[in-house]
């Protein structure tokens, strides 16, 4: 299919979606949600197509004006200048459209659930989980996204064995999905009297948040247990059975939620996480069928696997996937200024996809 045919196909799809959404009663609830999302995703692309096609028409008109024997010399000069500008614009617009035509992750527009867990490194790894958790909250605040803490499991010295949060907003998953993997930290722990450098690790999993209409969970597949929530050391922190443990029997996935005082709120949060994990599990199965070489999302948490290294002594953060190093670790972690990494990772992903299409 040619580039122009691809554009026409998108225009036709947009027309069909617009027609469907003009009569919402003809669609079911789930179909309406899907169509609305697709329509919203196509809007900026349609604007680009319109700009591209308008520029092409203007080039044709300018060329006709220049080649006409009736056009005076001054007008020809102005037309040539305008033609030069428009001809420079066409490749830029075409490149933007080529990027928009790349295979899309249908979950890119969704909100995201982040699950951060301590890997190798004991208490130091747990402290690093705490640092990452705060960094992602700061990043969300910079982007004006909504942050909803889901659950935190603390350690005795203020670290987190694991922490999860939901970050809401448009295209959150698109910008955060490349954070999935093993994050390695190199620093001297405060408890280390000899000043020896320690290496620890934490895993980050980024899951698209799934609405109930996107994934129905059969009640008979769930075992729901309630009990009294407990704090560090196992002491009870609640006199009612507010903590909730949900087991998805077919897959064995277990979600525990006890941060809220209300059993209803804990159950709601646990179901949100369960939906995201089940959706991600099904998505991974499909992707594994397409590419048997695909590795698991977060790895084992071993120090030897890593997507990014945070070296505190050198104030250095290195992303090993794109071989990019920035020397302002404290600013990035405290202020959540991740955009330079995120933008570079997105650009690298797009370049790889373009290369696959052209090869």
UniProtKB/Swiss-Prot annotation:
GO cellular component: a single term: cytoplasm
SUPFAM superfamilies: Release factor
Keywords: Cytoplasm, Methylation, Protein biosynthesis
Modified residue annotations for N5-methylglutamine: 235
Protein family per UniProt: Belongs to the prokaryotic/mitochondrial release factor family.
Domain of life: Bacteria
Subcellular location, record wording: Cytoplasm
Modification(s) after translation: Methylated by PrmC. Methylation increases the termination efficiency of RF1.
Pfam families in the record: PCRF, RF-1
SMART domains xref list: PCRF
Principal location: cytoplasm
Name of this chain's protein: Peptide chain release factor 1
Molecular functions per Gene Ontology: translation release factor activity, codon specific
Functional summary from the UniProt entry: Peptide chain release factor 1 directs the termination of translation in response to the peptide chain termination codons UAG and UAA.
Annotated organism of origin: Anaplasma marginale (strain Florida)
Gene3D superfamilies: 3.30.160.20, 3.30.70.1660, 6.10.140.1950
